[in-house]
Amino acid sequence: MKGQETRGFQSEVKQLLQLMIHSLYSNKEIFLRELISNASDAADKLRFRALSVPKLYENDGELRVRLSFDKEKRCITISDNGIGMTRDEVIDNLGTIAKSGTKAFLESIGSDQAKDSQLIGQFGVGFYSAFIVSDKVTVRTRAAGASIDQGVFWESAGEGDYTIADIEKETRGTEITLHLREGEDEFLNDWRLRSVISKYSDHIALPVEIETKNKSEEEGEEDTVTWEKINKAQALWTRGKSEITDEEYKEFYKHISHDFTDPLIWSHNRVEGKQEYTSMLYIPSQAPWDMWNREHKHGLKLYVQRVFIMDDAEQFMPNYLRFVRGLIDSNDLPLNVSREILQDNSITRNLRNALTKRALQMLDKLAKDDAEKYQQFWQQFGLVMKEGPAEDSTNKEAIAKLLRFASTHNDSSAQTVSLEEYVSRMTEGQDKIYYITADSYAAAKNSPHLELFRKKGIEVLLLSERIDEWMMGYLTDFDGKKFQSVSKADESLDKLADENKAEQEEIEKQLEPFVERVKTLLGDRVKEVKLTHRLTDTPAIVTTNVDEMSTQMAKLFAAAGQQVPDVKYNFELNPDHQLVKLAADISDEVQFADWIELLLDQALFAERGTLEDPNQFIRRMNQLLLSEKA
């Protein structure tokens, strides 16, 4: 061996290895699935590269994975004749984890073994799963197209470091030898290995072969070795749906996603006609750990005429459906397709539209057939789905049907109410869908803006996530009915309160001088001062006009570091509230000012959750409490 050196693992690799050995031990047989899956990927990459450089096959185009074991040496060897690796690639792939956010992810792992195994599985362990059953792993590899003396040797005990060196290797591809720990002898058994491969890797399009030694009947002659194929070795998506079991669909999902959990639902679809393609789409049962990371890769596996082209082809799914996993096999795209060609291509656009509709139909069917399962989906991916109305105007109505909200109809923060349910419960004469946005469910639920609606028995949607205000800027109507924020000043809301119009007008006339005094006092700090009959228990509220930026939108701008225009509120006073009546009767201008400022601060605090000068508010409150006692 030449160029031998010992290198230290990246700290995240050391941490992952320790976590994996302890957390995944109960499901240790998955090491074989992961290593065979990697070998399959290596074959896919070679096929793709060989489209433009055929000599990479090195006169050996029959791609396969081979498995052998040695009971005496207590070793299992998995070898492939795929793309192989250079020395630099070995260091990058086996010594480091390139995923952004890995450190934060590993820090989130706790002491709950069952939960940890799910999280680590979701992260995708790949090659490192070899250490679940091994106390030493040896790798011999050579990249396709490299010379025989450019082979690479890698070995580690899965602790702090690894050894790497240059070797000669006749054949291209990768050979991984696992030196089993004590107590792992169950895997030194032909039947056991066959059963694991059948369970996890039957769907792999690559032949998986196991070594069979045939005893020679003649004395002095050596035993012969043959290789027996033990999987179907046919791409799963090319088979008829009726031939595929649910277990095979689930295992294929785990193969392409490297997720350990079963998918929630899936759809296998073959289209013939103007465009010919096969798609296999999966909705995961849990969100990927790095879904909100901007560097998170997403998209479908792309095949053209059954030849693997690329992973993470994001051009076939809109961003709000980035959690959808699966593949598309197109007969219409060229074999030499690149990401750049996909970007501006009518075939791609048509496929994207069709696949988007298919994914939305899957979710719509789930919502109708199994509300409990759909709720599980919503808890994991609801926030992402809320990006849909802004991103996909074509499918806005279909997306809107899939949205779920908390509402005044249910005394719960759970987002379970659909817009169709809301519309079905609308009161007689109601022509709008009412909603409120706030910083929290409690703030929305207890907002004074809801008082009139509770009195009238009108349901209001309670929106309390940061994305909600932005979403409602695009979600303007549903089923022919406009959305209306209850925190906006609007004539239609005033009309709702017009029960005793003559009596209300009389009160307003009597309090005209009071309203003028308040206007004079506050000046241009507020847009308008008026009396309102929308309130029952609250003395005053502030509102914004329909065409102006809302409080929640202003908060979003501020959180994003953008300049926020001044929001001027309408100050609306409840003439039936005792505090307003008391304020109207105060003749002393200083005391009157304190009362009005206090009422305004209360309204602003209820609306924004903060005050510009909380100390002044406390001082006024204390003064009034003391004067009341005197």
From Swiss-Prot:
GO CC field: cytoplasm
Keyword Transferase attributed: no
Function according to Swiss-Prot or TrEMBL: Molecular chaperone. Has ATPase activity.
Region of interest (C), residue spans: 556-630
Record region (A): 1-339
CDD domains: HATPase_Hsp90-like
Name of this chain's protein: Chaperone protein HtpG
Signal peptide start-end: none
